[in-house]
């Protein structure tokens, strides 16, 4: 009987643990952390930019240009005289490599060009981690805005209309 009760408790805890990991991130939620690498193998977490508001572009490489107009507008606002304080803001990309047929070598080349264009960091999600941890859609372009405490302040899926920026 003790073994049966112990087994049930272990299974229940395991199920709760699995459900806690698979969350749909919503505005107002604290975002679960992650660890991703850049093209050189350097590891990054959200704490790599501690104290900054984060604009995270989670991108399927097949639609990597979809929100360039929005990113151009944000880049303009982070320059001198803009409305965004570049000392308190960091925009970067996470490539959803699991959602594409493109080879990783080509993806790294495309990402390198984007990193230069927007003077930013590009990280790689090879396993679809944010699809599982944050409930982000695959085969899409999603922009997530987190405040300095890593609370979600905005989620934009797909193309961002000009009226939003």
Could you tell me what each predicted segment is?
Residues 61-64, 96-101, 128-130, 159-160:
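Solvent-exposed loop/turn segments at secondary-structure junctions
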Residues 90-94, 105-139:
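Short, internal strand/loop/helix patches
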Residues 44-70:
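Short active-site neighborhood of thiol/selenol oxidoreductases, capturing the structured segment around
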Residues 51-54, 85-90, 118-120, 140-141, ...:
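Loop/turn elements at helix/coil->beta-strand transitions in domains of secreted/extracellular proteins
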Residues 1-23:
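Bacterial Sec-dependent N-terminal signal peptides
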Residues 126-165:
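Thiol/disulfide oxidoreductase modules built on the thioredoxin-like
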Residues 21-44, 65-70:
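N-terminal "domain-start" segment that seeds a small globular fold
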Residues 64-114:
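Structural microenvironment flanking redox-active thiols in thiol-disulfide oxidoreductases
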